[in-house]
């Protein structure tokens, strides 16, 4: 859900910044918009899909894939958080016509900044439970092997 929200917010920023008029001071193009940080929500959607697949068809490969995607999502969310903080801490003056759009864009960045820790915590939680699931699978496999050996004797 947070991935879809981030993508919609990026689309809103796209519409907002595409409508800027070149003024004396130029247009406001923040670093998060140029890098498409909110568009990285696609990785969160893919990660969620892999988690659902891992719960429906549990295997070591599915759990490992879901865990690796969650780790990637954590890294991307932390990078997005850092870029957003850098964007909000620096502000160049823009022309009077674009000031309202720049101000609204900064408010959207603040909203997204509040969602990045949520994304990190969700990905961390799923990664922890993925590790627990992988360890449990390995223990179950070892237990099954020892039971087969004991039954043979």
Curated annotation (Swiss-Prot):
Annotated transmembrane regions: 1-21, 36-56, 71-91, 111-131
Keywords: Membrane, Receptor, Transmembrane, Transmembrane helix
Protein topology in the membrane: Multi-pass membrane protein
Domain of life: Eukaryota
Gene Ontology process terms (BP): cell surface receptor signaling pathway
Locations listed in the record: Membrane
Entry GO CC: plasma membrane
Keyword Membrane part of the UniProt annotation: yes
Annotated family: Belongs to the MS4A family.
Job of this protein: May be involved in signal transduction as a component of a multimeric receptor complex.
Descriptive protein name: Membrane-spanning 4-domains subfamily A member 13
Organism of derivation: Bos taurus (Bovine)
Organism taxonomic ancestry: Eukaryota, Metazoa, Chordata, Craniata, Vertebrata
Gene: MS4A13
């Amino acid at each position: 859900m947070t991935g879809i929200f981030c993508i919609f917010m990026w689309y809103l920023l796209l519409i907002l910044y595409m409508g800027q008029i070149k003024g004396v001071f130029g247009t406001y193009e923040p670093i998060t918009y140029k890098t498409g940080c909110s568009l990285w929500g696609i990785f969160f959607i893919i990660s969620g899909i892999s988690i659902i697949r891992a719960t429906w068809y549990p295997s070591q490969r599915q759990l490992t894939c879901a865990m690796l995607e969650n780790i990637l999502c954590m890294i991307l969310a932390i990078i997005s958080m850092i870029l957003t903080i850098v964007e909000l801490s620096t502000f160049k003056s823009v022309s009077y016509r674009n000031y309202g759009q720049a101000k609204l864009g900064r408010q959207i960045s603040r909203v997204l900044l509040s969602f990045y820790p949520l994304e990190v915590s969700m990905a961390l939680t799923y990664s922890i439970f993925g590790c627990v699931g992988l360890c449990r699978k390995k223990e179950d496999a070892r237990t099954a092997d020892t039971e087969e050996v004991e039954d043979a004797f």
